[in-house]
């Protein structure tokens, strides 16, 4: 396998095997390469193509992408910075609204991105930095065998049914909600959990509303719609790609469930649920009706498991914590998982101790977040409005006092790992203690040099993790006025610092 930039020769069984080439798997590969750990990703699809619609990247994930060397220009090509997050009642009045990203005081923006284009951006970075053989397409990990002398053997099946094996020091299960790695680790786990809610996802070209980059959720706990732009407006027409998710809780006896977990449907199949949702500032039927179609799937998750680790094997992303999308943080958490796992390897080496440290830090608090999202997550405010006044009101303060609303949202941000103060102050001592700097040309050890700053300014040269070249690039994704200059010696020898992602628990 190619491992350009590592600067050393390693045996195949020293590498880390990653099962799954989704967002979490690719973020893991980029992180491992950044800290000098060789890896190979096995992905079931024969060809990487942009799939999916909109997702949100919370500031805690954008911080990690910045440290991986992704630029603002790159993310602007696949999405837009979010300016506002708002909940609206059935009569079109605001329940709650707050600024997001830099406008809220974060040091990093929040992005709404086209999931498929963002995934391809990660894939292109993996191929460019590590090499074309870094991701083995058409190869699915079906299980694993722990080796008596240490390490692990992954069992591989290709797209034609042929089987093979791959050995490594560790196996990272990033193979999604239907994870084969998790199924072997927890053979008695209950089936996928479905609470009766069905989602229809699509995009429409329309003019953005409110701030022009607002995330808006409206309705009740049994019927709601979310929409936000995932592209910049066309300067000629003013139209942007508006991502929307319509959701209705149905009876379990509905026949659609037997036709599959994921399918493409016509808008006419569900638009009648929202035909009266028209206000002077938004016409929901018109917005949905312009779409060519939608993707229908049940809102599902998995019950938490007591551990994500089995010796040299560990789970990340949806394989570890598939959760309802009510918090808009599934993709973000997968990125944070990868970075915390990498930080643990910087501290403990490519060892089972690193997996244990990662598991200890995240499994408990993220398991609580799964259940919190199952209970509507931040949309719990809409549930409260529905319970107290039926969803319509003249003055929201008469229904839910301002402090109660603010405290509710602050509690969710803390639980999900992106409370402002918690995230903005996380680097500092935490970075110095838990994530020593990586040297692109050396082995990861506890004695690796530490970087004394976590960002570079636009006017200095930085060593890119895209190989050996240096580039005069834009600053990483953070408030540039707070950027500090990296010492020259560190710039010459090190990648951007990998440090503790931090702040994922309340």
Model feature map: region roles:
Residues 3-16, 33, 58-186, 190-203, ...:
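Conserved N-terminal helical subregion
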Residues 438-440, 465, 479, 495:
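Cysteine-centered motifs
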Residues 3-14, 75, 91-92, 327-329, ...:
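C-terminal helical "tail/cap" subdomain of flavin- and related membrane-associated enzymes
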Residues 94-119, 123, 158-165, 203-293:
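Conserved FAD/dinucleotide-binding core of flavoprotein oxidoreductases
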Residues 17-46, 172-173, 200, 227, ...:
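Conserved mid-domain beta->alpha element of the FAD-binding
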Residues 497-505:
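Short, intrinsically disordered C-terminal tails of secreted or membrane-associated proteins
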């Amino acid at each position: 396998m190619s491992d350009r930039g590592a600067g050393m020769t390693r045996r195949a069984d020293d590498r880390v095997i990653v099962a799954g080439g989704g967002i979490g798997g690719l973020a893991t590969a980029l992180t491992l390469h950044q800290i000098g750990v060789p890896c190979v990703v096995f992905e079931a699809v024969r060809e990487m193509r942009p799939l999916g619609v909109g997702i949100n990247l919370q500031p805690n994930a954008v911080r990690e992408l910045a440290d991986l060397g992704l630029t603002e220009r790159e993310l602007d090509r696949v999405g837009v910075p979010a300016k506002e997050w708002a909940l609206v009642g059935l009569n079109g009045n605001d329940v709650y609204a707050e600024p997001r990203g830099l406008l809220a005081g974060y040091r990093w923006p929040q992005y709404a991105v086209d999931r498929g284009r963002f995934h391809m951006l990660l894939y292109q970075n993996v191929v460019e930095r590590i090499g074309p053989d870094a991701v083995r397409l058409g190869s699915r990990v079906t299980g694993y065998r722990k080796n008596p002398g240490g390490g692990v053997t992954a069992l591989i099946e290709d797209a034609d049914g042929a089987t093979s094996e791959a050995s490594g020091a560790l196996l990272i299960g990033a193979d999604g909600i239907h994870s084969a790695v998790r199924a072997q680790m927890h053979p008695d786990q209950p089936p996928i959990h479905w609470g009766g809610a069905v989602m229809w996802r699509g995009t429409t070209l329309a003019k953005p509303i409110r701030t022009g980059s607002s995330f808006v959720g409206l309705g009740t706990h049994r019927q709601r719609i979310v929409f936000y732009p995932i592209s910049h407006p066309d300067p000629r027409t003013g139209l942007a790609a508006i991502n929307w998710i319509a959701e209705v809780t149905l009876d379990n006896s509905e026949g659609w469930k037997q036709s599959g977990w994921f399918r493409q449907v016509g808008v006419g199949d569900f638009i009648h649920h929202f035909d009266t949702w028209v206000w002077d500032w938004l016409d929901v039927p018109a917005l949905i009706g312009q779409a060519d179609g939608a993707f229908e799937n049940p809102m599902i998750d998995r019950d938490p498991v007591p551990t994500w680790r089995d010796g040299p094997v560990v789970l990340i992303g949806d394989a570890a914590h598939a959760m309802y999308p009510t918090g808009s943080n599934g993709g973000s958490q997968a990125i944070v998982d990868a970075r915390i796992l990498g930080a643990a390897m910087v501290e403990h080496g490519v060892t089972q101790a690193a997996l244990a440290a990662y598991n200890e830090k995240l499994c408990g608090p993220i398991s609580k977040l799964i259940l919190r999202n199952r209970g509507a997550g931040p949309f719990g405010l809409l549930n409260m409005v529905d319970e107290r006044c039926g969803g319509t009101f003249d003055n929201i303060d008469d229904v839910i006092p301002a402090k109660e609303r603010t405290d509710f949202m602050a509690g969710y941000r803390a639980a999900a790992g992106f409370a402002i103060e918690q995230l903005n102050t996380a680097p500092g001592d935490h970075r110095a203690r838990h994530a020593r700097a990586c040297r692109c040309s050396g082995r990861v050890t506890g004695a690796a040099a530490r970087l004394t700053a976590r960002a570079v300014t636009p006017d200095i040269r930085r060593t890119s993790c895209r190989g050996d070249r240096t580039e005069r690039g834009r600053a990483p994704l953070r408030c540039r006025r707070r950027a500090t200059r990296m010492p020259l010696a560190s710039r010459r020898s090190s990648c951007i610092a990998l440090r503790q992602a931090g702040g994922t628990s309340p």
